[in-house]
């Protein structure tokens, strides 16, 4: 019997690793991980594809969790890093629920890898980095291998799929069905500068929100300019901020890379909680074009929705950092890489507006940072208008649709208006030839003077799509798995093309 079990598992290894080199670059690491899992499993003779997925995921979470202990011991002397690691560790507590769907599991694993890479990017230099970096690299390596195995197993046989929850996981849009088109009578708490609300600051209202709640908590923010740095912790899911309008309710700050070491922490508003919804307000960073990265809004929680909001900044203005996000009817303006990050994000019916950058700079709309082919991430810009602000001198400043922050950067521009501000090349390199053959840049049925593709870049990673089936891969239904969760948000959306 033991011989049978072992032989079966070796067969599974051959099947999984043999799916193709395309899905597991480091075959030895994948095989070693599977052998680790075999040693801890007692009944593999009856294993099915779904069971193998669960074994891989559960055991990997446990091993990643153990590996994190060593990193966190070192980060106790570094408050920012410790908070980041605690955030990732907190996310593992949701994993049992996330496993109820392959889509959720893939998103979660991608998010974990994104968090590790963000940490190592922003550690800085010196003795601390030399001590912590090897441990973080170990975490990144393990997360990459787990992702590769996950993809390989998932693609083996789609006749037995893990069931997808009809309306998203229980922590999102729970039994309460509070309508998003709110007023002060329906909101849980009201923020007002004039004293007519329970709180006068946004931070005070967020502090009052319950932790780990499965019910939605709605904060209505009345007209006013709120000069404060707002951080929504990942212990506060299902939070809604709703204002009186994107020109009336404004949260503003001016942190930048010139006075805060990490781009990640420059955000005027940072949401780390799953199920975040922002409606009818403005997120602003006034640091200016000369101060470097300065984020107005960073979103790091899964199944987040930004609706009818204004995001206003310069470099790195909007930072869709990780997980699934949906932006609808928003006004987004900036200069260099002003939509950047590693989220799975779809933008529909948004105004994307390039403004005047620092002298000598070019504008770049997107800097998507998908690091490996197994990570689930990418930006889709659908039915949007890409235009210029009145202050942009298009005669002297070039504007591009995007550049690859990392090798597998993924961006699609679909059915959108592209103004004449966009350079005929369309896209620009990050550094030399890096990523030009591995990125995924796509355009489909765009219009406007900047949509002409005859002079676009000749990179092998760039394509003009003709087949609607291929373009469909970048829609809400396919890219976001939006049909399983967006409808409960009551935000309008287009599922397909």
UniProtKB/Swiss-Prot annotation:
Catalytic residues (UniProt): 316, 337
SMART domains referenced in this protein's UniProt entry, alphabetically: PMEI
Gene3D superfamilies documented for this protein: Single-stranded right-handed beta-helix, Pectin lyase-like (2.160.20.10)
Disulphide linkage map: 330-350
E.C. no: 3.1.1.11
Position of the signal peptide: 1-21
Any one GO CC term of the record: extracellular region
Transition state stabilizer (site feature) positions: 315
Catalytic activity: [(1->4)-alpha-D-galacturonosyl methyl ester](n) + n H2O = [(1->4)-alpha-D-galacturonosyl](n) + n methanol + n H(+)
Coiled coil: none
Compartment(s) of residence: Secreted, Cell wall
Keywords: Aspartyl esterase, Cell wall, Cell wall biogenesis/degradation, Disulfide bond, Glycoprotein, Hydrolase, Secreted, Signal
Top-rank taxon, per record: Eukaryota
Residues holding substrate: 263, 403, 405
Keyword Metal-binding attached: no
GO terms, biological process: cell wall modification; pectin catabolic process
GO MF: enzyme inhibitor activity; pectinesterase activity
Matching InterPro entries: Pectin_lyas_fold, Pectin_lyase_fold/virulence, Pectinesterase_cat, Pectinesterase_inhib_dom, Pectinesterase_Tyr_AS
Tissue specificity as recorded in UniProt: Expressed in siliques.
PROSITE patterns per UniProt: PECTINESTERASE_1
Pathway: Glycan metabolism; pectin degradation; 2-dehydro-3-deoxy-D-gluconate from pectin: step 1/5
PANTHER family: PECTINESTERASE (PTHR31707)
Protein family per UniProt: Belongs to the pectinesterase family.
Function of the protein: Acts in the modification of cell walls via demethylesterification of cell wall pectin.
Name assigned to this protein: Probable pectinesterase 30
Lineage, top ranks: Eukaryota, Viridiplantae, Streptophyta, Embryophyta, Tracheophyta
Originating gene: PME30
């Amino acid at each position: 019997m033991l011989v049978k079990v072992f032989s079966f598992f070796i067969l599974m290894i051959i099947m999984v690793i043999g799916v193709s080199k395309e899905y597991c670059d480091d075959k030895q690491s994948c095989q070693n991980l599977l052998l680790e899992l075999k040693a801890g499993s007692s009944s593999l003779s009856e294993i099915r594809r779904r069971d193998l997925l669960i074994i891989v995921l559960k055991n990997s979470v446990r091993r990643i969790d153990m590996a994190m202990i060593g990193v966190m011991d070192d980060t106790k002397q570094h408050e920012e890093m410790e908070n980041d690691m605690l955030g990732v560790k907190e996310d593992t507590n949701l994993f049992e629920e996330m496993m109820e769907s392959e889509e959720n599991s893939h998103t979660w694993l991608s998010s974990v890898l994104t968090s590790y890479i963000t940490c190592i990017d922003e550690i800085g230099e010196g003795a601390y980095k030399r001590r912590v970096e090897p441990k973080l690299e170990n975490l990144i390596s393990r997360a990459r291998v787990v992702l590769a195995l996950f993809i390989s197993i998932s693609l083996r046989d789609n006749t037995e799929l893990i069931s997808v929850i009809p309306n998203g996981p229980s922590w999102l849009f729970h039994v309460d069905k509070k309508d998003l088109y709110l007023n002060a009578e329906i909101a849980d708490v009201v923020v007002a500068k004039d004293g007519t609300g329970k709180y006068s600051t946004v931070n005070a209202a967020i502090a009052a929100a319950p932790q780990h709640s499965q019910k939605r908590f709605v904060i209505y923010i009345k007209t006013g300019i709120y000069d404060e740095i707002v951080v929504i912790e990942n212990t506060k899911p299902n939070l809604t901020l709703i204002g009186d309008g994107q020109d009336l309710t404004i949260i503003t700050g001016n942190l930048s890379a010139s006075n805060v070491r990490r781009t990640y922490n420059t955000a005027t508003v940072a949401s780390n909680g799953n199920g975040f919804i922002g409606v009818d307000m403005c997120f602003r960073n006034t640091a200016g074009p000369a101060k470097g990265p300065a984020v107005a809004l960073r979103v790091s929680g899964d199944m987040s929705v930004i609706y009818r909001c204004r995001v206003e900044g310069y470099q790195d203005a909007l930072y869709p950092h990780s997980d699934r996000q949906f932006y609808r009817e928003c006004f987004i303006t900036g200069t260099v890489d002003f939509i950047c990050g590693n989220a799975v994000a779809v933008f529909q019916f948004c105004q994307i507006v390039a403004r005047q950058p620092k002298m000598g700079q070019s504008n770049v709309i997107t800097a998507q940072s998908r690091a490996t082919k197994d990570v689930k991430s990418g930006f889709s810009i659908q039915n949007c208008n890409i235009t210029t602000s009145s202050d942009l001198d298009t005669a002297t400043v070039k504007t591009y649709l995007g550049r690859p922050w990392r090798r597998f950067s993924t961006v699609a521009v679909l059915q959108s208006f592209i103004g004449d501000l966009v350079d005929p090349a369309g896209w620009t390199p990050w550094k030399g030839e890096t990523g030009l053959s591995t990125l995924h840049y796509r355009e489909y049925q765009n219009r406007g003077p900047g949509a002409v593709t005859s002079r676009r870049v000749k990179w092998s990673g760039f394509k003009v799509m003709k087949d609607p089936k291929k373009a469909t891969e970048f829609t809400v239904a396919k890219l976001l798995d939006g049909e399983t969760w967006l409808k409960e948000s009551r935000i309008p959306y287009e599922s397909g093309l």
